[in-house]
Amino acid sequence: MPDSYLLQNIDLVILAGGKGTRIKEFLGNHPKPMIKFNNKHFIQYVLNCNSKFNFKRIIILCGYRNKIFFEKLDKKLKNLTKIICIKEDKLLGTGGALTNLKKMHVKDFVLINGDTIFNINLNTLISSLSKKKIGIIALTKNKKQKSKKLLNLALRDKILYFKKNSSIMNGGVYFFKKEILKNIKNKKSSLENEILPKIIKSKKIQGEFFNNFFIDI
């Protein structure tokens, strides 16, 4: 299957509703992906990083203070016809926000965090997914090793499990089959802390390690 075909039939979904409590002094009342670097919003760098892939659509899920998000960014995105922004009436977290994809009739999709850049080949990630799994997570090196729960990649069959002080961590880039949405209810929840742990335990998701450029704000 050609690389171009893979992404032409897949949506890119960006989680852009984070509050950014760790960097609040730099954000003010703005959503985390709206922080500026060199007079450019971070989410614009995220979009530029993924513009080389020919996605069917780009769907941005906006949560925290989404009005500011639209006021600041809407003019810059108006010429990008494939981009759709979805506002949340109430904050649903990184898990609950994905329920908005059901009304968009989303099938298989790539999911990325709006506060992360992980410059990997998404075609490679998608092609690596086993037919028996419903998703795959891109993993990167954990240089700080401070998180309590990090994803470690087993040596056999690319099976994921949790391990403290692991040298490998979740890179914030995923490819999911549409079946993942059946595991998410329309209520506030965390993808990282509630939904993924259950799916990992059921062995329905796998991991793939990449040694590419990674930054998380």
Predicted regions and their residues:
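Conserved beta-loop-beta/alpha segment of the NTase-like Rossmann-fold superfamily
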Residues: 67-150
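Catalytic-core segments of class I nucleotidyltransferases/pyrophosphorylases
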Residues: 109-110, 117, 123-130, 142-145, ...
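Generic beta-sheet signal
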Residues: 15, 37, 61, 86-88, ...
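Extended acidic/charged loop-beta regions that coordinate divalent cations
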Residues: 153-157
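Glycine-rich phosphate-binding loop at the start of an alpha helix
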Residues: 44, 95, 99, 192
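N-terminal glycine-rich phosphate-binding loop and ensuing alpha1 helix
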Residues: 2-69
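Residues at the starts of beta-strands that form the adenosine-phosphate
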Residues: 11, 56-58, 82, 108, ...
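Conserved beta-strand scaffold positions in the cores of enzyme catalytic domains, especially
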Residues: 34, 83-85, 135, 205-207, ...
